[in-house]
Amino acid sequence: MRFVGGNKWLALATGLMVACGGTSGEDTTTEGAGGSSADSATTSGAGAGANSGTGGEGVGAGGQGPGPEPAAACQQTTDAIVAATGNTITVSPGPDGQVEVEGQLRTLRAVVRDAMPGDTVLLEDGTYLLPEADPSGFSGVYITTPDITIRSASGDPRAVVLDSAYRIHGGQSAPITVAAAGVVLSGFTVRRSIFHLVHFWDDGDDAVVHDVILEDGGQQFMKASGGNVDGVTVSCSRFEMTDDGRDNVWGYGSQNGNTTCYTGGIDTHDATNWHVHDSSFVGIYCDASGVARPAHGRAPDARNGMTYQGGLAEHAIHMWDAPDGQGHVIERNVILDCARGIGIGFNAEVHDTLILNNMVSSRFAGAREHDVGISVMRAFDTLIANNTVVYTHPEAYPDGIEYRFSATAGVSVVNNLTNQRIRARDGATASLATNVDDADPAWFVDAAAGDLRLLSCDVAAVVDAGTATAEVTMDLDHDPREGALDIGADECTPAP
């Protein structure tokens, strides 16, 4: 809502990623209990520590860039995480590759490995450089203990940085791997990985990733590999690719010159019941300009002299599949200048997904690096409602929303606002109602910068022109949708 002239909280108690089909990073049956570290656990008796709530510019749907300041509900979730703190293990940055715990130097991997269920690993402000792995070992944070929390003491995600520094952590392992249920990650940054930044394996159910900044993943920033990772919540977080990160994106493909970029935001396989909300995705695309990038990031044993330039990155959010009755909810996210926005399905069926109140914008030409805003493929019983998709480049990709393949069934496309086509492809059918596909960028506060809130409530084609939809009870800003619905992600309210 914008006065011209807030965050539904999923309770902690109830809420509380590898190339497709390729090799996994770490094997959860053999790795994680020991690894290459030999030091023993040391815990402190400190309390929960200070927490200033969600912080840092640009996290959640607001902060720097499009969107309001972080909603009160994001803070409510932060407060719930802090309130749930049990025994704490307080950690501060040490020399390269190490951390300090009660005067002893250890690896963060070992600290997390030795934590007990219910423990909180509390990170003091600073930068934590993760070590390079020994040739036969692993050095990333690998979580195999259920119900532990890793969070910042200050609550400021920009003040606590886990830096992979494009180092090898063993195999294709991530700086953070979740292979246990009920894990909470909150209030810090993880950045500069050759592979994924956060990787879920099949025991990583019911995790919460809240108020986390994920920056410069070499492959998809967050990955869930096959094995039915269920009930993960991603909230009030920021996924961002910088120019430097773009030069280190993983190149993927054959060695005959067809190598192309391989990165994206969230990418899940065999996952169920994920809730991705109130988060932002910025600049996740690959660039054909400039120097040739090294294929396979900075993994010299995998490059074999290969380079690449550009290519179409994965979606900011891509859920490849979900069985009947166990779909995903993707709502109130801001996606700015990413190669593709939200993707559901493709080569497998995905059921029962809700895509609600998201804003997707791009200022780039379509070319070969930028594509559709929202796409559902082989989707069943899926609702795409009250999203706003606006492209400002005169040669932008022509479609804002697509539904694809003849297998697609039970898809409803309702109350969406875009300046691009809403298009059926490959024999797909859907039910369409009260969508607008000829939006004028001048209707919005700042379309080029991704702020797609309505500048005026006098747009008759949009305001009070929507169809009542039971699943849509609030807008992007958590403001209620009362009476006649506006079309798009923003419910416009005249100034008092």
Where are these regions (language model features)?
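Right-handed parallel beta-helix/beta-spiral solenoid domain characteristic of secreted/periplasmic
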Residues: 102, 125, 129-135, 143-194, ...
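Acidic Gly/Asp/Thr-rich repetitive segments characteristic of extracellular carbohydrate-active
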Residues: 74-124, 477, 481-482, 486
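Predominantly extracellular beta-rich ligand-binding scaffolds that present long acidic/polar faces
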Residues: 139, 329-453
